[in-house]
UniProtKB/Swiss-Prot annotation:
List of residues binding a divalent metal cation 1: 112, 222
PANTHER family the UniProt entry points to: DEOXYRIBONUCLEASE TATDN1, TATD FAMILY DEOXYRIBONUCLEASE
Binding annotation for a divalent metal cation 2: 112, 149, 174
Keyword Ubl conjugation appears in the UniProt entry: no
Keywords: Hydrolase, Metal-binding, Nuclease, Nucleus
Name by which UniProt lists this protein: Deoxyribonuclease TATDN1
Documented EC number(s): 3.1.21.-
Keyword Ribosomal protein set for record: no
Sample GO molecular function, one term: 3'-5'-DNA exonuclease activity
Amino acid sequence: MSRFKFVDIGINLTDPMFRGIYRGVQKHQDDLQDVIERAVQIGVKKFMITGGNLQDSKDALHLAQTNDMFFSTVGCHPTRCDEFEKNDPDHYLMELLNLAESNKGKVVAIGECGLDFDRLQFCSKDTQLKYFEKQFELSEQTKLPMFLHCRNSHAEFLDIMRRNRDRCVGGVVHSFDGTKEAAAALMDLGLYIGFNGCSLKTEANLEVLKSIPSEKLMIETDAPWCGVKNTHAGSKYIKTSFPTKKKWENGHCLKDRNEPCHIIQILEIMSAVRDEDPLELANTLYNNTIKIFFPDM
């Protein structure tokens, strides 16, 4: 058994890729169980399955109910906030609230919510701002921490966060790729910073990682997305590799599909960049996560 313990705070296990389906076409057999097994082998103890909208949150919860290690989030991603307006916004919010309220114990966070100004083609700035703020009602009512998203929107994100900070018990800004100053401002609000492959692309990203105290960090894969590519600045620190094929083969990882087992690679990059003992850092990351998302453990 692995000497490491991990909570993958951001894992998209409802993604059809883990069922062998790519762009609606079945390319290989459903291998979700193998994916989970590989992750458990390297020490993943809990998987926080991300909910990206109402339906996705229902699917994430449904999956979470199949395994004691699975948990989920309830919320609406900034790029999908149009859904509030396509429906009755209050009713949509109420459905999210009911889903979270009636499944405490499995639902451990409100999210994924926040702002994403890199992808305004999916949802306008005004709509994102409005429904990010609206979702604080969910955290306020449920007393659950938030799983937050901030892309190219730091000033507006901070503004909304500051205004509503007393309405949420805390949370993490996941997949962080901002500046040292941005990280410091978020930490000033008592928020944690989540790192995955997308957070480790450039030397500047690595410098930001060094600047954050370990007791404010969390770790994630965001799989099947955000894998560490060879072109990423962090990739040179990876020690652990997995048997990987370009075409699916039983018992192997698939080249362009990130998996939760790759969380060990994120740890290796983080500990090398920060010059910290990997086991010590892993324990700190694990304890940070338990404190915020699993306080009754």
